[in-house]
Regions:
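N-terminal beta-strand motif that seeds the catalytic metal site of vicinal oxygen chelate
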Residues: 1-18, 48, 66-70, 118-123
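Acidic di-acidic motifs
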Residues: 15, 74, 106
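Short, conserved charged micro-motifs
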Residues: 18, 75-79
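Conserved active-site tyrosine of GNAT-family acetyltransferases
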Residues: 19-26, 82, 109
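Short secondary-structure junctions
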Residues: 28-34, 89-93
Length: 123
């Protein structure tokens, strides 16, 4: 098998319209299209996020506890912008010596992170 790349990241939600407002209006991701059966796709840079309600195909909903890291130019500025829009963060912004990270959740409890690597990657 040859994997070409990750095609999309699936984000399960309970309220698609509320999620659309959060991901598109609050986070500023680019809306692409509605998905038949309920849901939508939006873009974070070159990564497609497919946001949908799993209950539409009789699957249970459970929020994803594993962070989706959103790369931003300045974590402090992005955090201040989101806090101004009512987004609550889980903890102080972390400086790991390699990157800055700030953790938060979407309205359905899916884990998200603002991220910026500032140290060079090792070869």
């Amino acid at each position: 098998m040859q994997v070409e790349h990750v095609d999309f990241v699936s984000i399960c939600v309970m309220d698609v319209e509320r999620a659309r407002k959060f991901y598109v209006d609050t986070l500023g991701l680019r809306f692409d299209r509605d998905v038949p059966g309920g849901g939508f796709e939006c873009w974070a840079g070159q990564v497609c996020l497919s946001v949908w309600d799993p209950r539409t195909i009789d699957l249970p909903f459970a929020p994803n506890p594993n962070d989706i890291a959103l790369r931003v130019p300045d974590v402090a500025a992005a955090r201040a912008d989101l806090e101004g829009k009512g987004v609550e963060f889980s903890a102080k912004t972390l400086d790991t010596g390699v990157c800055h990270m700030a953790f938060f959740h979407d309205p359905d409890g899916n884990a998200l992170m603002l991220h910026r690597r500032y140290a060079a990657r090792e070869s």
